[in-house]
From Swiss-Prot:
PANTHER family: LIPID KINASE YEGS, SPHINGOSINE KINASE
Cofactor requirements of the protein: Mg(2+); Ca(2+)
Residues engaged in binding ATP: T40, G66, D67, G68, T69, I70, N71, E72, T95
Keyword Nucleotide-binding: yes
Protein name per Swiss-Prot or TrEMBL: Probable lipid kinase YegS
Gene from which the chain derives: yegS
GO molecular function: ATP binding; lipid kinase activity; magnesium ion binding
Role played: Probably phosphorylates lipids; the in vivo substrate is unknown.
E.C. no: 2.7.1.-
C-alpha cells in the first residue's frame, strides 16, 4: 500500500479498554502506518500532546473521543504557530459524536482511522467565544443546555443520547426560557429563548439538527432560536415543519453578540460556559481537517 506520514492519536482515557480500536491500530501498523498513541486523563493533556506531535513531525493529530475531545484537540491546533501544522483527524468514540456524524465520518473504527490518516485535508472554520473559548461544532443555550450539562454521567454511559430526553422530562417543571437580546450582521432579535443554537456544524444533543443549513467552510455562523414563554407548548410547536413554525427564528452572520439580564449557560461542544454577555465570531479556515470526499458540510 502507499506510504503515509506518521500520525498521533490523542485518545480519551474513557476509551482505553476499546479492544476493536486496539486491533484496528495494530492492523494499520502491520500495513506500515506509523501511529503514535497518547491518552488524556485531565484538561490540558491534549494541548501537551499536540506540542509533542509537532516535535515528532507527524502530519495528522487524531482526536479519539467525543465532541469534547475533538474540541480540545482542534483548539490546541489553531493555537499553533509556524509552518507544518498537523491536520486534524477524527475518530468518533464519544456518547453522541455530533460533529463526526454530521461531517460523515464512518462509524466503523477501521474506516474512520484510515480516513483520519489518509483523507484529504480541507481547510475548515472554527468559532471563538469572548476571544477565548473555541468550538468547532456548536454553541447551544437554553433549557436544552441545562439538561445536557446536568444529565448524570452514569445515565449517559448506559443510555447514550436517550439519557438527555429522560432527564429533560424529569426536569420539565423547573425549566424556564432565557430572556436575551441577540445581534449580528443584519440581524436583531429580543425575547424569550427556549433553545439557542449557534452552529459552525449542524447538530447537537445526540443528533438534533439545530442548524440544518450550516457549513464548516463558508465563513459564517448559523443561528436558530426556538422561542416561547412556556416550555411544553413551545416543545410541541417544534414538531411542526420549519415553514409553519412561528417559534423558530433564523439568522446567519460571521459574528453574534448575546446579552442577558441574568446568567445563561452555553454548551460549547460539551463544555459549559456561563455569563451575561457573549461575543461569538467565526475564525475562517482556522485549521485543516481530514474529511470524506462527500462531506455534506462543505460548500
Amino acid at each position: 500500500m502507499a506510504e503515509f506520514p506518521a500520525s498521533l492519536l490523542i485518545l480519551n482515557g474513557k476509551s482505553t479498554d476499546n479492544l476493536p480500536l486496539r486491533e484496528a491500530i495494530m492492523l494499520l501498523r502491520e500495513e506500515g502506518m506509523t501511529i503514535h498513541v497518547r491518552v488524556t486523563w485531565e484538561k490540558g493533556d491534549a494541548a501537551r500532546y499536540v506540542e509533542e506531535a509537532r516535535k515528532l513531525g507527524v502530519a495528522t493529530v487524531i482526536a479519539g473521543g467525543g465532541d469534547g475531545t475533538i474540541n480540545e484537540v482542534s483548539t490546541a491546533l489553531i493555537q499553533c504557530e509556524g509552518d507544518d501544522i498537523p491536520a486534524l483527524g477524527i475518530l468518533p468514540l464519544g456518547t453522541a459524536n455530533d460533529f463526526a456524524t454530521s461531517v460523515g465520518i464512518p462509524e466503523a473504527l477501521d474506516k474512520a482511522l484510515k480516513l483520519a490518516i489518509a483523507g484529504d485535508a480541507i481547510a475548515i472554520d472554527m468559532a471563538q467565544v469572548n476571544k477565548q473559548t473555541c468550538f468547532i461544532n456548536m454553541a447551544t443555550g437554553g433549557f436544552g443546555t441545562r439538561i445536557t450539562t446536568e444529565t448524570p454521567e452514569k445515565l449517559k454511559a448506559a443510555l447514550g443520547s436517550v439519557s438527555y430526553i429522560i432527564h429533560g422530562l424529569m426536569r420539565m417543571d423547573t425549566l424556564q426560557p432565557d430572556r436575551c437580546e441577540i445581534r449580528g450582521e443584519n440581524f436583531h432579535w429580543q425575547g424569550d429563548a427556549l433553545v439557542i443554537g449557534i452552529g459552525n456544524g449542524r447538530q447537537a444533543g445526540g443528533g438534533q439538527q439545530l442548524c440544518p443549513n450550516a457549513l464548516i467552510n463558508d465563513g459564517l455562523l448559523q443561528l436558530r432560536i426556538f422561542t416561547g414563554d412556556e416550555i411544553l407548548p413551545a416543545l410541541v410547536s417544534t414538531l411542526k415543519s420549519d415553514e409553519d413554525n412561528p417559534n423558530i427564528i433564523e439568522g446567519a452572520s460571521s459574528w453574534f453578540d448575546i446579552q442577558a439580564p441574568h446568567d445563561i449557560t452555553f454548551n460549547l461542544d460539551g463544555e459549559p460556559l456561563s455569563g451575561q454577555n457573549f461575543h461569538i465570531e467565526i475564525l475562517p479556515a482556522a485549521l485543516r481537517c481530514r474529511l470524506p470526499p462527500d462531506c455534506p458540510l462543505l460548500r
